[in-house]
Amino acid sequence: MADARKLLGRMGEEAAARYLEKKGCRILSRNHCCRLGELDLVVSDGDVLVFVEVRARTGEEYGLAQESITGRKKSRLRLLAWQYLKEKGKTGSMCRFDVIAVLFDREGRVKRLEHFENAF
């Protein structure tokens, strides 16, 4: 079960990265890890650093993917972003937090991809 969830997560991140590249964003980091956790994607959108949380699902019976980001998760992502900015010497950079929700069909094809800019 955990392996299937990891695979779904990787598929979602790949779909999100392709989508963002088509929009003209530059991927700076995928799965950036530190002791506090992991950032799914870090991209540049012009002069803005964007921290992207990707949520992938195969159905909506448990709610929408973007609804699964709790207040605690948002706080953790802000901390991770601050750590990233400190590591890269970019603490003065403009940044935002986006969410990309990817819904896959049973064959693993993207059924719907939604991008929420400035999600929190």
From Swiss-Prot:
Q: Which residues form a coiled coil?
A: none
Origin species, per record, is Pelotomaculum thermopropionicum (strain DSM 13744 / JCM 10971 / SI)
Domain of life where this protein originates: Bacteria
Q: Which GO terms describe its molecular function?
A: nucleic acid binding
Known NCBIfam families for this protein? PRK12497.1-3, PRK12497.3-3, YraN family protein
What name is this protein filed under? UPF0102 protein PTH_1707
The family this protein is said to belong to = Belongs to the UPF0102 family.
Pfam annotation, one family: UPF0102
